């Protein structure tokens, strides 16, 4: 792969979205594998900030704590609205 003379744009927002998405997928699977209701547990964590809602299994607790709760909620809200026909600016 060669280099180009054109400026490459780095979009931090896209990388953040991807990281949050991957984290939520991992956490969801870990909760499911442990027999919990993943939605209830994630909502409990987001509302309370108490990491005890998320198991240490598959490093899920450490992964989710890498993101600010408000950033996770922001991405979830944007995703929901965008998938319901709302143009997010």
Swiss-Prot record:
Protein name: UPF0297 protein EF_1202
Similarity section: Belongs to the UPF0297 family.
NCBIfam families per record: PRK05473.1 (NF003997)
């Amino acid at each position: 792969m060669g280099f180009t003379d054109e400026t490459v744009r780095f979009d931090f927002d896209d990388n953040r979205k991807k990281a949050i998405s991957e984290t939520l997928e991992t956490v969801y699977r870990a909760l499911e594998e442990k027999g919990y209701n993943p939605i209830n547990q994630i909502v409990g964590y987001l509302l309370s900030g108490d990491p005890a809602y998320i198991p240490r299994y598959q490093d899920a607790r450490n992964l989710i704590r890498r993101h600010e709760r408000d950033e996770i909620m922001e991405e979830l809200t944007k995703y929901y609205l965008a998938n319901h026909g709302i143009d997010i600016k």
